[in-house]
Regions:
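Conserved aromatic-histidine-acidic binding/catalytic patches
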Residues: 2, 88-92, 124, 132
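Active-site-proximal flexible loops/turns
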Residues: 12, 37, 130-134
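C-terminal catalytic histidine-bearing segment of alpha/beta-hydrolase fold enzymes
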Residues: 81, 101-149
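Short beta-strand immediately N-terminal to the catalytic nucleophile in serine-hydrolase-like folds
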Residues: 1-3, 29
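The feature captures the conserved acid-bearing segment of alpha/beta-hydrolase catalytic domains
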Residues: 24-109
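Short glycine-enriched nucleophile-adjacent loop
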Residues: 8-19, 135-137
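Short, internal active-site loops enriched in acidic
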Residues: 6-8, 73, 123-128
């Protein structure tokens, strides 16, 4: 499953909030902001979520095969959520991706939860789905064989 920008926001929240365990490989790219697994109010954190998030769900999310991609030049403010809650996550998509990923590493370490996500910085790419898609395809199709894009 692949999502870019708002699509990435949808996928990571769907993986957190749904009861669907069928997602075997997810790539989220250049999300504008995230739902952190912390005490911030929903939707910026998981405090007061519309549904109960079980510890089992958090463990599944953390151990899922998920790849977070971010363009190394995705630092613009175009169509970026600049609300107070979003700005607490970082000043741009690149900072927010780094902060979100780091928060998941820390959560895993503190709670002894296996963390299987990977972080990929796609150099010289800004907020461009067409430039992120080749990297996402290589990840999603890695077990198919030699992929030339």
């Amino acid at each position: 499953m692949y999502g870019h920008s708002a699509g990435a926001q949808f996928i990571h929240r769907y993986m957190l909030l749904s009861n669907d365990y069928r997602i075997s490989n997810a790539v989220i790219a250049n999300a504008g902001w995230y739902t952190f697994l912390n005490g911030s109010n929903f939707p910026y954190g998981i405090k007061d979520t519309p549904i109960n998030i079980s510890s089992e769900r958090v463990r599944w999310l953390m151990s899922s095969k998920t790849n977070l991609l971010i363009g190394g030049s995705d630092v613009g403010l175009q169509s970026l959520n600049t609300s107070k809650g979003a700005m607490r996550q970082g000043n741009n998509r690149l900072e927010r991706a780094n902060n979100y990923f780091s928060s998941l590493i820390l959560l895993g370490e503190e709670n002894k939860i296996p963390f299987r996500w990977n972080f990929h910085l796609i150099k010289d790419v800004a907020h461009s789905n067409s430039e992120m898609t080749p990297a996402a395809a290589k990840i999603l199709l890695a077990d198919v064989g030699d992929i030339k894009l």
